[in-house]
């Protein structure tokens, strides 16, 4: 079985549907139906010979000129040892020279409880006369899936449990007494049902993970009573995982059998299950990888909790609640952490890289449907690659996957995961480049503004009133909707996008508009007439996005942005309240300011779409941004969100524009690193506020510090999207990743100085532009800029969640003030402002860098002192005690 498929099935516990490759999405897709003809008769004869294990009869189907070695190998594969059942399914046919038809055929063979699915390319040649039978002229294997098992519980053998203890990394299952049943493959037991009262103990070593467990359960360990368990494991691990002395055979009890079979039938299909419904009615599954374990544990408080150890995953321990779609704990085991270290990139496991996209998509807004044709230029990264996994919305039907080099290709649907696996007809070497053409059609639900945008959507509004005026419909297809076939992770590539919409709609997409929208000549119903927009992304982008709505083109401008200019376009929905000149000037000013800090703008054009809405927010894909505009008369007020800065209304705009640099030009290596996008965009909005409106910084810092302190106990910045995930409260995510992250950058700036900070930020941007970075990459750049080690700073503020407590005292003499700081806990690096207010009303601020257990500094005085305070400017994430 290809390694990509093993990782897909075994590591991620997916349920897949091996449906017809050209017939559409969904489970149990019917195979291509061909008329009864000479080819059909040939395939029936092939199936009969294979099912009978008759190698001689199968070889008799070959043409006289066929390559005997390859044909004999094929015959041996499907007949030896004799199968118990064979299904031959034609998937595609295409004409070749001299009347030859090239067939794509799947052959499924069962031998006992083991199954094998092979995909073969067969050239069939007609006989010399119409009455002569067709013959096999050549045969070659395209792909094979082995290790399929028709698992069933062994109800003939029941075991008494006597103090059974099952251990997996950071998990212990104790069952003092009860009943057990096994399900086995020829290699040994691979599944177990445990019936009886016991206890599960999940104890993650990582502090951040223990915090998440505490949020769920009220304690740092998840210790829960259970009454049944279902386990999956490698047959080769059974002896190490299960103490056989704890299992004693006993007389089978029919009541226990009914219970165990019910548990097995309910829980076994949840993992490693393969749906072959169009060729077999049986349930087929794969075995877990060596050292992998899946445990479904039914608890009293939380229902069924799933533990999965998937050794091929970068974070190989996962505990989650399937029913509520809630991740409880995801982290790297101690063994893997010792081998690899903390940092990793999601790209490390990729078999290929997408270099370019060419998308032609027709949108039907009234049905939220897409008819698309996507071409992908792909470069193979790993030797031996025989399949490619792509992301694409599960709701669409795939009309076909093609390659100019290989013709029509088979694909496998991954149910529930918005994924397809494309089988290649041969193993490809690293460095090979090819084009894929994916044709698809069907509904795709538009994407809601998500956590990557500043969406004020949590908590009750101050006044619960509704706006009765209907809002202009808008349909956003971006990084979460999988509206086009793409890599399994965000992946930098260039792109050309052609978007066709009804004549009364407009479109904005990733890329520079290259021509005015075209409209077919003639009149008629606007819903039937359509127009096409074309966009060119000449510089690499992480993902592609489209928004379809009714837009008015308001303004455009050319902006100097560092080493190059940017074409700016302003558009809005019809009723969005927009001050055109002010919006253009402010947007241009923000873009130019950011470019002055970092050296350039990443993309040659930018479109700002202003959309009417009942709440603030926005979304910023490459090349454009959508910014919500509150309709006049709206009485809904969202004051309790951490990122709602009412005294600086341009903050949303500044944040979204900053994403063109942070989040788009520079991406993040994995979800832990999302602060490199959100916190950086947030802090650049702070920098713009500091420049644009004198006196705005203290209020912004005060709100950021307050909300960061309130939410810090929920976990560190490095936890990413999982902050607030268990509680279902996105405000926690925004308070920590947005606000605390921005505060960390502000503290870093004050710790290392202006020149080092801004020089380091520019160097980081220029070095990592159009690549994905991590916290360690950022730290190393800033260390070079500052000329000092910053490991402790990042360990505390990015990877830690504690808030330091610092005791502050001061002593005044006639000419100087002596200030002393004592860190009451672990020593951290923190710059703290000492504010001296003189009786004259003059205020002096001095930044004192704290890097030791005790810090003392003498400050010359300029007059009689009224007060002396520490951290009055709220610029440090510390608690000051007097």
For the regions a language model picked out, list residue spans one by one.
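Extended, low-hydrophobicity, Ser/Thr/Pro/Gly-biased non-transmembrane segments
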Residues: 227, 233-351, 437-551
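A surface-exposed beta-strand-loop module
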Residues: 147-165, 169-256, 385-388, 393-459, ...
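Hydrophobic alpha-helical and helix-loop surface patches within well-folded domains
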Residues: 22, 418, 535, 567-823
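Non-catalytic accessory/interaction domains
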Residues: 290, 298-338, 343, 349, ...
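Bacterial N-terminal signal peptides
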Residues: 7-21
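Exposed beta-sheet edge and beta->alpha loop/turn motif
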Residues: 94-150, 839
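Hydrophobic helix-coil surface modules that form long, contiguous segments used
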Residues: 341, 347-373, 379-384, 391-394, ...
